[in-house]
Amino acid sequence: MAKKSKIAKNEKRKEIVARYAERRAELKAIIRNPNTSDEDRLDAQFELNSQPRDAAAVRVRNRDSHDGRPRGYLRKFGLSRVRMREMAHRGELPGVRKSSW
């Protein structure tokens, strides 16, 4: 079980990313566009740098939806490998079967 503060911090980061996502995409498009003037590109870079660090999507950590475990995360299920295995053995994941060959 992850610390509650770590889970809460990650949720806060998700909210900040959502709030700034549209403007960040606009600024990145301006920076990447080869037809943009140097002055506009520089202004866009300064604005992007002045945004909070947590506005970057790479700072959000994928965590297990049940206990917040940060490692061994399986995107398809939204669970860690440990929790997924436990739930699969109990038959709580529809369509998941133990493999046999």
UniProtKB/Swiss-Prot annotation:
The keyword Electron transport does not apply. The lineage of its organism: Bacteria, Bacillati, Actinomycetota, Actinomycetes, Mycobacteriales. This is Small ribosomal subunit protein uS14. Residues 53-72 are annotated as: Disordered. Keywords: Ribonucleoprotein, Ribosomal protein, RNA-binding, rRNA-binding. The gene is rpsN. GO terms for biological process: translation. It holds the Pfam family Ribosomal_S14. GO terms for molecular function: rRNA binding; structural constituent of ribosome. GO terms for cellular component: small ribosomal subunit.
